[in-house]
Amino acid sequence: MTDTSAPGDAGGFERRARQNQAERRANLETTYDFIICGAGSSGSVVARRLAENPACTVLLIEAGPDDEAESVLDPALWPANLGTDRDWGFQAEPNPHLDGRALSMSMGKGLGGGSSVNVMVWARGHRSDWDHFAAETGDPAWNYASVLDIYRRVENWQGQPDAKYRGTNGPVWVQPAKDPSLIAGALLDAAEALGVPRFDHPNGEMMEGVGGVAYADMLVREGRRHSLYRAYVRPIADYPNLTILTETVVRRVLFDGRRAIGVEIERAGSISPIKASAEVVISTGAINTPKLLMLSGVGDRDELARLGIPVVQHLPGVGRNLQDHVSFGCTWEYREPLAPRNSGSEATLYWKSRPDLTAPDLLFCQVEFPVPSERTALLGVPNHGWTMFAGLAQPHSRGRIRLKSADPSEMPVVDANMLSDPRDLEAARACVKLCREIGSSDAFRPFVSAERIPGTGRQIDDAFIRDAAVTYWHQCGTAKMGSDDMSVVDAKLAVHGIAGLRIADGSVLPRVTTGNTQAPCAIVGERAADLMRRQYRL
C-alpha cells in the first residue's frame, strides 16, 4: 500500500499498513463498534470518517479482492475488469420492452467498488436532484446548497480556481481530463454550434440550469486511478482501530429483536458471526443491499414468507424503485486511428429532450472507441471509431430486485424493466436524434469518415432504440429515503423500524442523479458519517 497523501514516506507507510492489516486479519475481534459492509464509493467514506476517531473500532468488509491490479490502477484498462472477479456480473431478466433482451448489469467487486472499475468521471448531480431529495425526506440537509458545502469540503480540485463551487483541501483528487483527445474537443465545438452552452468544468454552474457541455472531471492522480477507496481508506490503512477484510461475504445481518447486533460472514469457506456494539452500515450497492436486507428478514412480508425467511421488519419498498441510466450508442468510423486518452471518456454533455424542461433529462458520455450492444454490433463495428454513449439522465421506468431463494450464495433476480414507461421511449428518440446531429456536424468532419451505427441515412425507429439499449451501470433507488410506505430509510439513513442499522450507498437515492453516480455516493457516505459521529459524539 502507498499513502498517496505522504509520498515522501511511501515505503514506510507501505510496510506499516501491510503489517497492520495482516495483524488485524490474523487476530479478528469478536466485536467492533461499527461494521461497514462494502468498501465501495460510500462505504469507504464511512469507514474513513469513523476511523478518524481513535476511540472507535471499525471493521470494513469487502466481498471482492484488493485493488492492487494494473486493470484497476491504469485508467485506460478499466474495460478489462468487466466480466472478471472484480465484477459482480449480474444479469437482468429478459425484458419484453427490449424485445426480450437480457442486459448485463456490471457492478464493481473489490476495494473501491464501482470507483475501482468505472470510467473515473466525477459528476455531482444536478441542483434539481438534490432539492428533490430534500423534498422527499423533508430534510433541508439534503438540498443542493447543503450538499454543495460537502462537495467543497471533500474535493482537492486541480483545475482553474473556482471558490464558489470547488474545494481544494479534501481527500478526493479531482482534475480536468489531462491533455484530452482532439475528438473530445470536437464534441465541445459541435455541441456549442448547436446551441448547447459550454463550461469550464461540469460541476458548477453547468449543473444548475438546463445543462451544457464540458471536458469531464476525473479521479485520476499522477496518471493512476484515484478511487474513493484510495482517496479515503488507503491513507489510513496503518490505523490500529481499522480492520479491512477482503474476499469476505456478508451473508446476513444479525438481530436481537429489532436491533441489529452484528453480521454473519463467510470467509475462506468458514461461516462465523461478528458483533457490532454500535451500528451495522450496509454499503453493498443497489442490487446487493436489498438482497442482504431481505436475506436478513427486512422486506415485504409476503415475499419473505414465500421463501421461509423469518420477518424482522415489514418494509415493502425493499428492492423496489430500481433505476439506471439507459444508453443508446451511435458509432462513427475514424478517418485515421485516434488512440483513446485518459480513460477514453473525456467529454460530457447534459441536455433536454423537450424545450419546456428546466433541467437536463439526457446524458451524453463520449467514448473514444466503439461500444455497440450485442444487437447493434451486427450492423458492423469499425476497427477504429468512437461512440456517443447517449442516454436518459432521468428515466421514468422502474424495476425491482427480488430474491431467487433464501440461499445467500444465489444471485438475486434483477427485473431492470428499462423502457417500460412510454415517456422513456419518447425521450430516447430525441436523444438519438441529437446524438446523430452532433456526430455528423462540421466539427467532426476532419476526424470521421462515416456514421456506422445506426448507419448514414437510416431512419431511427423504436426497433433500433430497443436493440441499442444498454446500461450505464448506475443502479440506484432500491432502498430509498423518505417517509412514505415504500421508503426504506429515513433522512438520517436509518432503516425504518430497526435500531442500529443504517444504509449508505446509491440504493437510498429516491431517483438516479443526473450523471455518473460515484460522486453522489460519496456524499451519501459523508452524510452517513456526519450523522453517526453526531449521534455517538465521536
Regions found by a protein language model. Name each.
Residues 1-538:
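N-terminal redox-cofactor-binding region of secreted/periplasmic oxidoreductases
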